[in-house]
């Protein structure tokens, strides 16, 4: 007898149980790692138990002013943490490879905290960074790792999977906010998690994918979206559901990098988002690798290296040209 496809029981596939009170029991998780000499945790909102894990490169040239990368981890909005081993290790490597200070954000998870909770936490992290930058100007204080060693005018916002979705949605929320002296030079959406009621071609073709089977992604959306809405909600399907206000705001996004892989069921959604942003006048760079699967950079060192190289080149191009002329960020 053949083994059932990975999508036959999405709860079992995701190793979760939905409890009667609406909370989740998460049966298996990545181990959580404590901060190291090159990282530390800063409380963000103690009521919400959110924090920022800051990573710095091992070898920082003297008198250098490093760029800042705000990072949002993946996990379908319901799993994992900024302290989860794969994301901690990835941020450690990125800080070294990119010579960048990385702020990895611990945001609230669904279904205990449905969207837009994660977006609100993301905005709070961006505003925290702004307040840190303004501290010395206003006679206040600034975190010691940020005070003298960063260039607040070279900030990037990056996320993977659900974190990529957060990047898009936090950009909508802060595009009209005065963040000075912080300047967001670019957005980086890596394998961003978007959806819709009607399956895309890649979702249909890869419906039994071993990483993102279609029934599992449907379950993720049912657990994270606001009660009573479907997958065409604007949080998951901005192409179908964005109104005039969202379209106007996305037209003021800074330069944006969208990265994806041909073996990811979500890849068509990512392509569609890229085209949507281009249609609003955003400078969009895309890298879609024929090979690879969802989250492959967490398991394949060569894919991780290629991703870091792509991100590094994008950051350098943003720094040399400056932010998009249509961006207020």
From Swiss-Prot:
It catalyses: a carboxylic ester + H2O = an alcohol + a carboxylate + H(+). GO terms for molecular function: carboxylesterase activity. The active site is at residues 161, 264, 294. InterPro entries: AB_hydrolase_3 (IPR013094), AB_hydrolase_fold (IPR029058), Carboxylest/Gibb_receptor (IPR050466), Lipase_GDXG_HIS_AS (IPR002168). It is an enzyme of class 3 (hydrolase). Transmembrane segments: none annotated. It holds the Pfam family Abhydrolase_3. Its EC number is 3.1.1.1. It comes from the Eukaryota. A motif (Involved in the stabilization of the negatively charged intermediate by the formation of the oxyanion hole) lies at residues 73-75. Expressed in leaves, stems, flowers and siliques. Keywords: Hydrolase, Serine esterase. Carboxylesterase acting on esters with varying acyl chain length. Belongs to the 'GDXG' lipolytic enzyme family. This is Probable carboxylesterase 8. It comes from Arabidopsis thaliana (Mouse-ear cress).
């Amino acid at each position: 007898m053949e083994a059932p496809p990975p999508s036959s029981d999405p709860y079992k596939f995701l190793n979760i149980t939905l409890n009667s009170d609406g909370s989740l029991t998460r049966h298996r998780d990545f181990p959580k790692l404590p901060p190291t000499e090159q990282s530390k945790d800063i409380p963000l909102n103690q009521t919400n138990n959110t924090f920022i894990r800051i990573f710095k490169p091992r070898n920082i040239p003297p008198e250098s002013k490093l760029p800042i990368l705000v990072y949002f981890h993946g996990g379908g909005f319901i799993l994992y943490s900024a302290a989860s081993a794969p994301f901690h290790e990835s941020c450690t490597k990125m800080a070294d490879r990119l010579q960048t200070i990385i702020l990895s954000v611990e945001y609230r998870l669904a279904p205990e905290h449905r969207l837009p909770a994660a977006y609100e936490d993301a905005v709070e992290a961006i505003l925290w960074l702004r307040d840190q930058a303004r501290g010395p100007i206003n006679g206040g204080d600034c975190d010691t790792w940020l005070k003298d060693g960063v260039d607040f005018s070279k900030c990037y916002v990056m996320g993977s999977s659900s974190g990529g979705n957060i990047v898009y949605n936090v950009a909508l929320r802060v595009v009209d906010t005065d963040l000075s002296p912080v300047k967001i030079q670019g957005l980086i959406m890596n394998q961003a998690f978007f959806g819709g009621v009607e399956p895309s071609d890649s979702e249909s073709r890869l419906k039994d994918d071993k990483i993102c089977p279609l029934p599992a992604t449907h379950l993720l959306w049912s657990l994270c979206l606001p009660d009573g809405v479907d997958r065409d909600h604007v949080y998951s399907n901005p192409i179908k559901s964005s109104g005039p206000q969202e379209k106007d705001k996305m037209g003021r996004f800074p330069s944006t990098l969208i990265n994806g892989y041909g073996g990811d069921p979500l890849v068509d959604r990512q392509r569609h988002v890229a085209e949507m942003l281009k249609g609003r006048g955003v400078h969009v760079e895309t890298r879609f690798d024929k090979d690879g699967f969802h989250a492959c950079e967490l398991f394949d060192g060569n894919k991780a290296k290629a991703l870091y190289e792509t991100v590094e080149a994008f950051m350098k191009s943003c720094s040399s040209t400056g932010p998009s002329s249509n961006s207020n960020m």
